[in-house]
C-alpha cells in the first residue's frame, strides 16, 4: 500500500475515534489546541496556556485563532479554568 493510502487509513481511524468521543464537531483549530493541551497537561490534567501555545502542533497558529479556540474549548466544557484568577492555568475537563 502506498504511503498516502496508509495515511488516509490512519486519518479515517482518527476521525472515527473523534466521532465516538464527540470531537468531530470542533473546528480544526479547536481540535489542535485540545490535542496539544492533552499532550502538555500534567498528571492532574492541569496545563498553562503558554505551554500549549508553544507546542509544535499549534505554534504556527495565529495568536487570535489560538486564543479564540482556547476560549471556545472553555465555553464548550472541554477545558475549565484551574484558578479563580486569570493566570492561564486550565484543567482538562473531558
Q: Model-found features: residue ranges?
A:
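Short, cationic-aromatic polyanion-contact patches
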Residues: 84-94
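Short amphipathic alpha-helical interaction segments
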Residues: 60-75
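A short, conserved structural fragment
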Residues: 74-84
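Alpha-helix N-cap/helix-initiation sites
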Residues: 23-27, 45-46, 59, 63
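Short acidic, hydrophobic short linear motifs in intrinsically disordered regions
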Residues: 43-57
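Short alpha-helical segments that sit at the start of domains
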Residues: 4-40
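Short glycine/proline-centered loop/turn elements that form peptide/ligand docking sites
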Residues: 49-50, 67-68, 88
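Long, compositionally biased intrinsically disordered regions
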Residues: 1-4, 44
Amino acid at each position: 500500500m502506498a504511503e498516502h493510502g496508509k495515511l488516509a487509513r490512519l486519518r479515517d481511524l482518527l476521525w472515527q475515534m473523534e466521532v465516538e468521543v464527540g470531537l468531530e464537531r470542533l473546528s480544526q483549530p479547536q481540535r489542535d489546541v485540545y490535542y496539544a493541551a492533552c499532550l502538555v497537561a500534567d498528571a492532574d490534567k492541569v496545563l498553562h496556556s503558554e505551554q500549549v501555545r508553544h507546542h509544535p502542533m499549534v505554534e504556527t497558529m495565529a495568536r487570535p485563532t489560538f486564543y479564540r479556540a482556547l476560549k471556545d474549548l472553555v465555553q464548550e466544557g472541554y477545558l475549565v479554568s484551574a484558578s479563580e484568577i486569570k493566570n492561564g492555568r486550565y484543567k482538562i475537563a473531558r
